[in-house]
């Protein structure tokens, strides 16, 4: 099980990433958790390093990965 990383965001609470499978899980502040498949490590790292994780999610993950 991948370790959860807290996010500083008004919409996103935390995320976890499995580098072997490319599975990214994002938990929203609402409590809902969504899973995205085949996400490159570079996208996960971008999410962690983004000054606005919510904006990064909307531009680079939402609608791009299932």
Residue ranges and their predicted role:
Residues 2-66:
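Acidic/histidine-enriched, beta-strand-rich ligand/metal-binding domains
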């Amino acid at each position: 099980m991948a370790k959860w990383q807290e996010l500083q965001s008004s919409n996103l609470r935390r995320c976890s990433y499995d580098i072997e499978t490319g599975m990214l899980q994002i938990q929203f502040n609402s409590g809902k958790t969504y899973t995205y498949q085949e996400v490159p490590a570079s996208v996960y790292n971008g999410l962690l390093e983004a000054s606005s994780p919510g904006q990064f999610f909307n531009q680079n993950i939402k609608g791009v990965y299932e």
